[in-house]
Amino acid sequence: MEKKTRLFGTDGIRGTANQYPMTPDMVVKIGQAIGYLLRKEAEEKSSSVRKVVIGKDTRLSGYMIEQALASGLNSMGVFVQLVGPLPTPGIGYLTRTMRAAAGIVISASHNPFHDNGIKVFGSDGFKISEEMEREIERLVLEEDLTPLLPPSKEIGRTRRIEDSQGRYIVYVKGTFPLEYTLDGMRIVLDTANGASYKVAPSIFQELGAEVIQLGDDPNGTNINDKVGALYPQKLAESVLHYRADVGISLDGDADRVIMVDEKGEIVNGDRILAICALHMKERGLLKGDTLVATQMSNFGLEKRMNEAGIKLVKTGVGDKYVVEEMRKHGYNLGGEQSGHIIFLDHTTTGDGCIAALSVLAVMKQTGKKMSDLNHVFEDVPQILINCRVKRRAELSELAGYNDMIRNIEKKLAGNGRVFVRFSGTEPVIRVLVEGTEKAQITQFAEEIASFLEKELS
């Protein structure tokens, strides 16, 4: 095996369970590396806080990885609190409120069940910095950690926390305006057989909604299996069948959401951002009159924001880059077309339940149906193709690539764009083409995808 120099992608460490780096021995060492850094930090601050909160989604491999992580952390003198299946943002919240030194989520988000991953939050509830990621990688890949283990009497313990779900439910409900309820609203809710299958229905039901559930029967292998935010078609059909007011679809770890209006039309992350940004600006709540999005967002969103006097700032793809930009400049709303929506007034990362409640609050406060809100802007035609590849390469160094892109951009004549990037979480390269003519941009996207599949297979 070639020497690995990186473990972290754009959203933590990911891989196939029981394959590198998601093997028990590697996960133990990852736990030890995190534990060593936390112990070192506590000693430098003369602090006794060496507590880590660990949550997970519903994947079969979550049990194995949970035990391996806890063992590694315990061996470095760190105390572990296991909270079981809970949305990723819930771990960020509990890390802060339980005064833990760190929080860890065991999840591969929207990936299939056979994948799993590790995301790490700092004591402030935000994902750790790239500098800390590099230091964890260095310890895992280059160091023998055995000499760094503390004496036997300083080994940590692990215990389970039983009321974590209730704490998260109360916290999320608290973001909904007190003067409103969801009484009389019928919601179809798809929890992707994932981390939110228990908490999400309770949140909406306790606020008064009638909830019809999909994807609420996890068995360890059916997470994201034709359900959840990547598969909103079934949700749309159910909304029409049950004559619901709205559909809400979460992904496996519930940090993102896609919605459906009462007519069965999909409301993606761009539209959720636009709906909330316009509503917040109207009420003087949008800090800096600015919305943060990514390069994947539709140009129609940018046009609508400009018309409304809202500045749109674009970052690299990945919710952590959106959060970095928001924190750096004090903005309070940002997100991605894929459904990661971040309300920094309430949370430290994308939260599908909070985002959905924010849209429902707009419906209640304006008296508008979801379909009325969904007409917030007109999409510029956009084609996205995900190509599975076997290797990565510097695209500009592939023979013929630059000429192909230049030729396509020339034909678009300033009325569109081409955006190509490797996924940070999957062996996939994403090809995005925007323009005025759908047939033309489809042809261009397929041409680029065919070229890349051939060159990178």
Swiss-Prot record:
Cellular component terms (Gene Ontology): cytosol
Protein name: Phosphoglucosamine mutase
Cofactor note: Binds 1 Mg(2+) ion per subunit.
Active site (UniProt): S109 (phosphoserine intermediate)
Modification Phosphoserine occurs at: S109
InterPro entries: A-D-PHexomutase_a/b/a-I, A-D-PHexomutase_a/b/a-I/II/III, A-D-PHexomutase_a/b/a-II, A-D-PHexomutase_a/b/a-III, A-D-PHexomutase_C, A-D-PHexomutase_C_sf, A-D-PHexomutase_CS, Alpha-D-phosphohexomutase_SF
Gene Ontology biological process terms from the UniProt entry: carbohydrate metabolic process; peptidoglycan biosynthetic process; UDP-N-acetylglucosamine biosynthetic process
Organism of derivation: Bdellovibrio bacteriovorus (strain ATCC 15356 / DSM 50701 / NCIMB 9529 / HD100)
Cofactor names: Mg(2+)
Residues forming coiled coils: none
Post-translational events: Activated by phosphorylation.
